[in-house]
Amino acid sequence: MIKFNIRGENVEVTDAIRAYVEDKIGKLDKYFNDGHEVTAYVNLKVYTEKRAKVEVTLPAKNVTLRAEDTSQDMYSSIDFVEEKLERQIRKYKTRMNRKPRNAVPTGQVFGDEFAPLDTTDEVAEDHVDIVRTKHVALKPMDAEEAVLQMDMLGHDFYVFTDADSNGTHVVYRRTDGRYGLIETE
């Protein structure tokens, strides 16, 4: 069963919007096994130019699904995000079935409610071509210093060792121009 955490920025999350989100995104519940509890983090934003942005993140075991859409109509953005998430689930399951690994089998996360996507036309798209490998020495520093290093290098992310916890972290530049921090466990 999917639980919902719905937030609104510059918009009141009315009962009608909440019901619509829960109905549309709730349809994805059929793709998850009964034993897995998933929380959908939904962020609804309205900008001054009357554009609506919908962001949905579904963290599941070994995979995090995320989709967003911006349009003039909040409801059509919700529809489009639901379609994107469904496609991600199907594509993920197809890839995992094609390349068996030591990871969790997809049947343990996603149920067998649907057939895998026919991706004969997308084989080239699925191929990952790593064109460069870098080896870096991680320096102990705090997040602020890592952001400064990232900016000096002109990169969108920077991997570093946190001086306090000794853990490997990543700072990154978000699409809104602010910064994010990923802390590994």
UniProtKB/Swiss-Prot annotation:
Entries under Gene3D superfamilies matching the protein: Ribosome hibernation promotion factor-like (3.30.160.100), Sigma 54 modulation/S30EA ribosomal protein, C-terminal domain (3.30.505.50)
Phenotype seen when the gene is deleted: No visible effect on growth until cells have been starved for 5 days; cells recover from starvation less well than wild-type and are dead after 14 days starvation. No 100S ribosomes are formed even in stationary phase.
Keyword list, A-Z: Cytoplasm, Translation regulation
First-listed, main subcellular location of the protein, grouped into a coarse class: cytoplasm
Subcellular localization: Cytoplasm
Matches recorded under InterPro entries: HPF/YfiA_ribosome-assoc, HPF_long/plastid, RHF-like, RHF/RaiA, Ribosom_S30AE_C, Ribosom_S30AE_C_sf
Positions of region (Required but not sufficient to restore ribosome dimerization, in vitro will replace E.coli RMF in ribosome dimerization): 126-185
Region (Probably still associates with ribosome) location: 1-125
A single GO BP: negative regulation of translational elongation
A GO MF term: ribosomal small subunit binding
Domain of life: Bacteria
Family per record: Belongs to the HPF/YfiA ribosome-associated protein family. Long HPF subfamily.
Primary role: Required for dimerization of active 70S ribosomes into 100S ribosomes in stationary phase; 100S ribosomes are translationally inactive and sometimes present during exponential growth. Able to dimerize E.coli 70S ribosomes in vitro.
NCBIfam families in alphabetical order: yfiA (TIGR00741)
Quaternary organization: Interacts with 100S ribosomes in stationary phase; alters the relative position of the 30S and 50S subunits.
Protein's UniProt name: Ribosome hibernation promotion factor
Gene source species: Lactococcus lactis subsp. cremoris (strain MG1363)
